[in-house]
Amino acid sequence: MKSAEIREAFLGFFEEQGHTRVASSSLIPGNDPTLLFTNAGMNQFKDCFLGQEKRAYTRAVTSQKCVRAGGKHNDLENVGYTARHHTFFEMLGNFSFGDYFKRDAITYAWTFLTSEKWLNLPKEKLWVTVYATDDEAYDIWTKEIGVPAERMVRIGDNKGAPYASDNFWTMGDTGPCGPCSEIFFDHGPEIWGGPPGSPEEDGDRYIEIWNNVFMQFNRTADGVLHPLPAPSVDTGMGLERVSAVLQHVHSNYEIDLFQSLLAASAKAIGCSNDNQASLKVVADHIRSCGFLIADGVLPSNEGRGYVLRRIIRRACRHGNKLGAKGSFFYQIVAALVAEMGSAFPELVQQQSHIERVLKGEEEQFAKTLEQGLKILEQDLADLKGTVVPGEVVFKLYDTYGFPMDLTGDIARERNLTLDEAGFEREMDAQRVRARSASSFGMDYNSLVKVDVATQFTGYSATTGSASVVALYKEGQSVSHLNEGEEGVVILDITPFYAESGGQIGDSGFLQAGDARFDVSDTTKTGGAFLHHGVVASGSLSVGAQVETQVADEVRDATKLNHSATHLLHAALRQVLGEHVQQKGSLVDSQRLRFDFSHFEAIKAEQLRALEDIVNAEIRKNTEVMTEETDIDTAKKKGAMALFGEKYGDSVRVLSMGGEFSVELCGGIHASRTGDIALFKIVSEGGVAAGVRRIEAVTGAAALAWLNSAEDQLKEAATLVKGNRDNLLDKLTAVIERNRLLEKQLEQLQAKAASAAGDDLSSAALDVKGVKVLATRLDGQDGKALLALVDQLKNKLGRAVILLGSVHEDKVVLVAGVTKDLTGQLKAGDLMKQAAAAVGGKGGGRPDMAQGGGVDAGALDSALALAVPFVEQGI
């Protein structure tokens, strides 16, 4: 069976069993702020399982698209090198929300897998696991389904804690949970590996193909499991894995779905279609990239966009490794659409968009990849040892745009590892430099000298026609810019707004026949507007006629935020006083940032008042008025001017809400205040002495922020078994209970220390008439060790004591010397030696000292220093 046939068979089978076919949700989780990407079929049903959402059906079946790259579930570094790791995969799943339970779920799974009508897998090839104490599931499998006991495996708590098992599923530390039952397929003795639960279980012979999760408990904060009133079922079967089984292959990359993508990848790259890891990387990555872009993710330097960029660049690097010349990755999109478009129509609808995004990102990366690879090869040739230094990894990241995992791929091919800690140190240092940077960097704008006054038409237009007046590359005038080159374009007329007054410059593109210049930013020097960007295709020359196009969506969102800053400024003067002056701002399409003079933190009630005032003006939906006048007339009308801003003879006065807000401003704004829709403050804090900062969102971004806050509130209420009305009371009770438990724990630890003291005193050695006790008590904190040393000094008399512990991944040390010995031996001196041995520091009084370190493996050696310390000191 082909993969598409298996997908449809699964959906059809469960429809026959009364399930509602539900479309795959977006890869961008719509109801879970804790997830970077959708990574399981149950994600879209989370609220159903929690009882917070009721749907028209109680049985559902889906084929869910999933991505695991970045965050907790990150398979990126393994992709291409193993048979089953992917950045994108399909999860077939059937779900019951308080409807059927174990018996039906198990019966459905077995019927679909083994019935001649459906997959017709040989029963003798299937193994089943259950949670160790789930006798109900075990009996159903053995007594009703007929799976022999020798192919049944009970899996206990194999992860070091109660209910921490491969066969016990939890949504979190609290909440719905329950045992699960996994079905494995035996690929045969020619493949290495053992059954689940055996020492060889990590081999490839026995592969899990289906997991049935039985949500029958609710785990409370105290760890107790309480039966759910309406148990549910959540199952998942990887389409790629079951396709491999049915197509009699042992690697997911050998299934029909991947064979077409591998062939298309090889064709686009111009290489042979053989079993190369790099080709598998490309074929895998086109799926995750295509689906992510179709769902609205774009390459960027943060969040989901950065993960997408990493995947694209990893694919490009592996393509180049196989000999790709020029852009190739975007060419594989057509094969992806042909293979999966019928099941996921968004691929068909977004095909051209996906191709444009991939081509643009690939071209941008290609400009620096070759040079970066040469630098890396040079550094690796000079490398001594097997660890690539953090500064090398950072240089590639910072200068050439190499994500760390891309450098890691190259290093792994040479059996090298990365100094990740060193990389993080370099990143921290860069952040410090960025905060302190001012005007010391190279400013190519200052090198642009052109006697041109660009005519600005952007107040009323976002498109137009213009002539190229001048071109600059790295600050030097040039006659043309070729494809792939970055530069600055100056036009005689433009709708692009140049960065000013805190509003970012416009982005978009310039088109001249086959030539296209992508504008990433617009600035101004003198009267000239500088369009910064890169030639995406063709060649652009001075004198060329171009069509201009501002990015409308970015412009629209930015102007709403800009108008909101004016309303906020006026509201601040109302609430805080007339002393408030704007000290700076940054307005882009995502949010607004407003710095202002004020002498203290703003109180919560003042923040609420600010929001109320601004939103009241928004609801009035008054027209935003502009007027060109001279500076003196504007000031007489009460227009506020920015401190330190230079104004010409003619100024633009912007009024909102009549006289509510009147300011001098040359920026782009909303037509009416109602266009802003909603205003929400998301943060307030100090940035300098006497300067405060407010960050806020508007419109759709504000609504998204409120929805996220509501989701988090619901999550918090669920964790404490409360609701919105009693959440504070519940949290107060939890905090008080925790305080009491901590007090009880301290008392128990004191008792345990006392008992331990009795046992330990007999282990002391006699060294030159001094009792010496040096031992480790892992798990004890410093407070407990101090109490124990005090007790031991009383018990032992003339003594030197050194106790150590590994507590929360750190070494804790306490040393004690009885007072009759402090003239000869000092606890602080002993502690300095012991702490240094574990990579730390320590010190204290002559009779008592504390210290610690990070090298737990050296703790025993540190404790061994006590005896020679006494021998040398007496």
UniProtKB/Swiss-Prot annotation:
It comes from the Bacteria. It is an enzyme of class 6 (ligase). Keywords: Aminoacyl-tRNA synthetase, ATP-binding, Cytoplasm, Ligase, Metal-binding, Nucleotide-binding, Protein biosynthesis, RNA-binding, tRNA-binding, Zinc. Its cofactor is Zn(2+). Pfam families: DHHA1, tRNA-synt_2c, tRNA_SAD. The keyword Transferase does not apply. Signal peptide: none annotated. It catalyses: tRNA(Ala) + L-alanine + ATP = L-alanyl-tRNA(Ala) + AMP + diphosphate. GO terms for biological process: alanyl-tRNA aminoacylation; negative regulation of DNA-templated transcription. One of its GO terms (cellular component) is cytosol. Binds 1 zinc ion per subunit. Transmembrane segments: none annotated. Belongs to the class-II aminoacyl-tRNA synthetase family. Consists of three domains; the N-terminal catalytic domain, the editing domain and the C-terminal C-Ala domain. The editing domain removes incorrectly charged amino acids, while the C-Ala domain, along with tRNA(Ala), serves as a bridge to cooperatively bring together the editing and aminoacylation centers thus stimulating deacylation of misacylated tRNAs. This is Alanine--tRNA ligase.
